[in-house]
């Protein structure tokens, strides 16, 4: 694989990775321990990520259980969760916290699907821009006499195949996320 194609593929792969990360942050019907990754707990005066202070599990699709390693800090963990933007009120039994996430409404699911499609379109635009840049570079090489017209056409076809591959990948990722969101 030539340098221009390798560079284009790396950029397209990066666009796909960004999309996957953005979609992972969108909550589908299931409670995911990663939802608590951003929560910081005051641990002896030091803000500490919750996942470094407790075991977080998802025993049921809409329930997370937070089991602190230091049970004396359960009230601090509870306060940190209440202050977060999750809008969830933890239930404590003194040893563990249970977080019950409400069922997503049909309307909210549709909003999330729209958001997924918007993010996908942004990724596709980025991939197409990479294709445009690569094609411009190839045309410039032809203009400077570095490659022939036939070579330019061949390279443009390779770039187009690569673009098509990544657009299909984006569509697959979006389809899977949409299915996950609409699943009840």
UniProtKB/Swiss-Prot annotation:
<comment type="function">
    <text>Responsible for the release of ribosomes from messenger RNA at the termination of protein biosynthesis. May increase the efficiency of translation by recycling ribosomes from one round of translation to another.</text>
</comment>
<comment type="similarity">
    <text>Belongs to the RRF family.</text>
</comment>
<dbReference type="InterPro" id="IPR002661">
    <property type="entry name" value="Ribosome_recyc_fac"/>
</dbReference>
<dbReference type="GO" id="GO:0005737">
    <property type="term" value="C:cytoplasm"/>
</dbReference>
<protein>
    <recommendedName>
        <fullName>Ribosome-recycling factor</fullName>
    </recommendedName>
</protein>
<dbReference type="InterPro" id="IPR023584">
    <property type="entry name" value="Ribosome_recyc_fac_dom"/>
</dbReference>
<dbReference type="GO" id="GO:0006415">
    <property type="term" value="P:translational termination"/>
</dbReference>
<keyword id="KW-0963">Cytoplasm</keyword>
<keyword id="KW-0648">Protein biosynthesis</keyword>
<dbReference type="GO" id="GO:0043023">
    <property type="term" value="F:ribosomal large subunit binding"/>
</dbReference>
<dbReference type="InterPro" id="IPR036191">
    <property type="entry name" value="RRF_sf"/>
</dbReference>
<dbReference type="Pfam" id="PF01765">
    <property type="entry name" value="RRF"/>
</dbReference>
